[in-house]
Design a protein with these regions (language model features):
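N-terminal beta1-alpha1-beta2 module of alpha/beta enzyme domains
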Residues: 1-72
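Flexible, glycine-rich active-site loops centered on histidine and acidic residues
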Residues: 2-18, 81-123
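Generic structural signal for well-ordered secondary structure
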Residues: 52-56, 80, 87
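Active-site nucleophile and cofactor-binding loops and adjacent substrate-binding regions
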Residues: 74-82
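Structural motif
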Residues: 43, 75, 105-107
């Protein structure tokens, strides 16, 4: 059997809130888990009004906590935007809470506009 996965952006549709989008993301993860999918990925995007997954590690914890066995991961974290140590600590902690279920995908593209990029790298 082929392993299948889903990549979700936690899209905030017109008339919906970020809370609605994250509830829909969890619902989708539960459905694809029940259908036998093996992984659920969340994408990191910043400063976009229609996407609720900017705090990717937090969203991954939310999805992993609401599912039983599906692997949950970042597809991907743009490492130039973050301290590698912080990412390692966040995903190590997630792995402690959800052993064998957390995946970390890394990228190197800025993935955002210059103003947001400067704000991300400031810290």
């Amino acid at each position: 059997m082929v392993d299948l996965s889903v990549l979700d952006l936690a899209y905030i549709g017109e008339g919906f809130t970020p809370a609605d989008a994250l509830a829909n993301t969890l619902d989708l993860a539960q459905h694809v888990e029940a259908a036998g999918f093996t992984r659920f990925w969340l994408a990191e995007h910043h400063n976009l009004a229609g996407i609720a997954s900017a705090a990717t590690a937090v969203c991954i914890g939310h999805v992993a906590g609401g599912t039983k066995s599906i692997r949950v991961g970042a597809g991907g974290i743009m490492l130039p935007n973050h301290s590698p140590m912080v990412i390692a600590e966040q995903f190590g902690t997630l792995e402690t809470f959800f052993p064998g279920r957390i995946d970390l995908g890394l990228g190197r593209a800025p993935g955002t506009d210059q103003q947001t990029l400067r704000a991300l790298r400031r810290g």
